Amino acid sequence: MKYKAHDYQQYATDFIIGHPVSCLILDMGLGKTVITLTALWLLLFDYFEVRRILVIAPKRVAETTWPAEIKKWEHLYGMTFAVAMGTAGQRKEALLSGADVTIIGRDNVSWMTKNIFFDFDMVVIDELSSFKSPKAQRFKDLKKVRPMAKRVVGLTGTLGNLMDLWAEIGILDMGQRLGRYIGGYRDRFFLPDKRNREIIFSYKPREGAEEKIYELISDISISMKAVDYLDMPECISNRVTVSMSESEQVLYDRMADEMILEYGEGQDIDAVNAAALSNKLQQMANGAVYDESGNVRNIHDRKLDALEDLIESANGKPLLIAYWFKHDRERILKRFPARDINTKKDIEDWNEGKIPVALIHPASAGHGLNLQEGGSTIVWFSLTWSLELYQQLNARLYRQGQKHTVIIEHLVTEGTVDEDILRAIEKKDTTQNAMIEAVKARIGGMTDDGRSNDEGI
């Protein structure tokens, strides 16, 4: 296929070429893979600046998206690639193949650094949030070999929170902008927030810290949002509210108030902390909950009833249903002839319109999956606190190439934690927009623009 770059794509490609260290914050659907591959081809065969390139990506993206994109575009002809997946022997063979581009799953980074001589002069990290934790082994191991690469590119749809930025940017620039040690970064830009006499549980940014941090990374960062650059179809977000019966609501409220719900047959459902409580309340809002013995206790079918109405009204139009808990999936499958989206074959069948009702878990539907050809309606049966997973799944349908209006349906149980989750997602999105604007690239009339003090770059 011939590649005709949009202005923003050419700008982003030129940015990679012009910056040995670069961070591209590109909204879903903008084509960050082909943008990056175009820059890699030019650096390999026009500028002769690099010899071997390592691409680190989530497993499914490494297996399917990057190889497919290299094969897809005519202008990338001549670029050889190898996929370092499978058994240790297969991974080793790919890494030693001498291919121009070697693609490896992020979960194999530590294995690679321990078993293979690092012989890459450029590294591409897709998705940058994979390295947001300085305590993660993959971060520590990649950090050891990072100085051997003279060029590095970080790709992400969204930057992490301010504390995460230290690791995400540090793995790119080796601590030049935000400091070499997490303790120094924390002391410089943050103040203790929630704490008791001995333990600090969380930190909050100092006044003006946010603007200063974005200013420090602005020279290597560009950010683009799809709505600014693409002729996208309309996206409509709906809320389908369901209500529990009085007795069901009493059970829900009692657990919220008392943290422990006496639930029949002597089984206690114990939420010992806020996270566990939220988890239990989410399950109950969906209609079932695991007790302490791991058994599923049904509470209501309100969301299943609402889902039945949506399936009926779709009249054969494909629906992509997002679930979170295993019992959500089991209850949906028991009631409807749905099919999971897990394998390459599942994705192909979905895009060919062969799956009227599809099930997908947000954590397995992240970066790089193209599902826009198979449907345009997402139903969030289970909501998620993760803004990143929420946006990533929505962007599987609401992206370049989508020809129809995208409908996002949220099943919300009235008077439950579901309402809190939707509010949190909206609040996080507002904060994220502020962060993105601080480093946003402007084209045509716009400027170019756990704790340990010993963790270091």
Role assignments for model-derived ranges:
Residues 105, 329, 337-424, 428:
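Conserved RecA-like P-loop NTPase helicase motor core
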